[in-house]
């Protein structure tokens, strides 16, 4: 990877065209913009309406956590004194400084991004919160946006709320098909503005489970430079990679090899590796974009919870980066075993009735139901929502992951929570539902052998 100091960083003014009209018109919070000045030595602040910490009833917070190196061992961590006071008080919009500092170090260690090189980090109430704000500060109503298809269902309403024109980029088992993306951009009408953003989940994509290969990532980055768009890299399953090959570099890391740096806005989540309910995620990317997101935060929810950030920092600081790495490796191995159990049941019950590709990261199987002799036909909606549910199993029909809707024979199934016996029962019930529909369609069980190895998008 090229030395970061040899790379040209896009200037702040470059991002003016990527900031939405609403974000440009948003008036900054007069109080929050001045809060950093309270820390200037000698300044007596009469600025903020902060409650006096002496009135808070909490005096100490202790919690126990498993050791990342020995899960049978626990340690008790305590937050009190000035640490607790900071956790109970209003804090900086971008985040709790000790945690921000820790995250800066993490992004340096994992992605090769050094602090002070034109990028910053902001905390959010989960990565979903940050994605919502990023879209709103970058996209104007009616804009065309590039989204991989199938796509994470949680972003579709965000784009729909802005009446966006969702341009579907084809994917397969290797991630975004760069040939599809190139065709879209090269054939774009000359009288219409090109999309400013591309949304993608490169590791263990939700719903497909696909992980983008290194070659595909490089091709997408090249197209981002050629056609001038920002990659929204939503990577909640980055730490849940369990493939046989070494983990591919992120877009955030790979862009250091580009002639210019600053076309990736990255979203990380602690939900899958520490706690979903603690609601903490962080965004890393160009300062101009993160500052616009911070302005949105300052006039909406003000900040991410200081207390949850203080708890997370206390834990991570006690672990060190090495302990964090060990913990995430343990989590990814846990889900690899879950994947294998689920796939074993699929081979047992769905051979000849479904097609799938084995995921290398994440929590999901994405499989195609063979509901009729014509394998290109079929709609999983009735099979899953009605037939399968009547038999006692819930899964999600694939239509909910298509940016512009429509029938599809695909289904998403999560394997994160279910034990081995329930997995066996659930997949057997899906088999029974498929057979019921095939009988209505006048076909029986397919006997041509296992089909799971094919890329089936």
Task: Describe each region flagged by the PLM.
Residues 285, 366-376, 393-428, 433:
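Conserved PLP-binding active-site segment of the aspartate aminotransferase-like
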Residues 52-59, 206-209, 239-242, 274-276, ...:
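Short catalytic/ligand-binding loop motif for oxyanion handling, primarily in non-cytosolic enzymes
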Residues 116-118, 358-364, 406-408:
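Short Gly/Ser/Thr- and Asp/Glu-enriched loop/turn motifs at secondary-structure junctions
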Residues 256-336:
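Conserved core segment of the aminotransferase class I/II
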Residues 328-343, 353-372:
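Conserved glycine-rich beta-strand-loop-beta hairpin in the small C-terminal domain of fold type I
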Residues 45-48, 168, 199-202, 232-235, ...:
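Short beta-strand segments
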Residues 69-228, 232, 238-259, 265-269, ...:
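Conserved core of the PLP fold type I
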Residues 2-98, 105, 390-393:
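N-terminal "arm"/small-domain region of PLP-dependent enzymes with the aminotransferase-like
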């Amino acid at each position: 990877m090229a030395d970061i100091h040899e790379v040209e960083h896009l200037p702040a003014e470059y991002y003016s065209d990527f900031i939405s009209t609403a974000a440009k018109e948003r008036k900054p919070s007069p109080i929050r913009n001045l809060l950093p000045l309270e820390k200037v030595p000698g300044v007596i602040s009469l600025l903020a309406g902060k409650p006096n910490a002496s009135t808070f009833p909490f005096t100490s917070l202790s919690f126990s956590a498993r050791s990342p190196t020995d899960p049978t061992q626990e340690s008790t961590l305590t937050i009190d004194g000035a640490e607790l006071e900071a956790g109970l008080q209003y804090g900086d919009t971008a985040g709790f400084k000790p945690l921000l500092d820790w995250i800066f170090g993490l992004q340096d260690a994992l992605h090769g991004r050094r602090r002070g090189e034109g990028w910053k980090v902001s905390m959010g109430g989960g990565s979903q919160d940050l994605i919502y704000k990023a879209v709103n500060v970058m996209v104007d109503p009616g804009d065309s946006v590039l989204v991989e298809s199938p796509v994470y269902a949680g972003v579709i309403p965000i784009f729909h709320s802005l009446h966006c024109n969702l341009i579907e980029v084809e994917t397969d088992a290797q991630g975004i098909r760069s040939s599809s993306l190139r065709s879209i951009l090269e054939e774009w009408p000359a009288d219409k503005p090109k999309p400013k953003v591309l949304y993608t989940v490169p590791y263990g994509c939700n719903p497909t489970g696909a992980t983008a290969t290194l070659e595909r990532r490089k091709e997408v980055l090249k197209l981002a430079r050629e056609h001038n768009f920002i990659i929204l890299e939503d990577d909640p399953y980055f730490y849940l990679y369990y493939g046989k090959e070494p983990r591919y570099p992120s877009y955030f890391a790979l862009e250091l090899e580009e002639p210019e740096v600053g076309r990736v806005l990255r979203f990380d989540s602690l939900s899958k590796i520490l706690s979903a309910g603690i609601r903490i995620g962080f965004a890393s990317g160009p300062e101009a974009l993160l500052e616009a997101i911070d302005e949105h935060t300052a006039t909406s929810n003000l900040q991410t919870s200081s207390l949850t950030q203080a708890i997370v920092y206390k834990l991570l600081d006690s672990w060190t980066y090495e302990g964090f790495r060990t913990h995430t490796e343990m989590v990814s191995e846990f889900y690899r075993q879950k994947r294998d159990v689920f796939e074993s049941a699929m081979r047992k019950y769905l051979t000849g009735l479904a097609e799938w590709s084995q995921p290398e990261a994440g929590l999901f199987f994405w499989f195609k139901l063979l509901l009729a002799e014509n394998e290109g036909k079929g709609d999983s909606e009735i099979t899953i929502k009605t037939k399968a549910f009547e038999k006692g199993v819930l899964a999600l029909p694939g239509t909910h992951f298509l940016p512009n809707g429509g029938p599809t024979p695909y289904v998403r199934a999560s394997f994160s929570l279910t034990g081995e016996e329930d997995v066996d029962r659930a997949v057997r019930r899906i088999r029974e539902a498929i057979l019921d529909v095939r009988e209505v369609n006048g076909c029986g069980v397919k006997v041509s052998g296992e089909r799971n190895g094919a890329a089936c998008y």
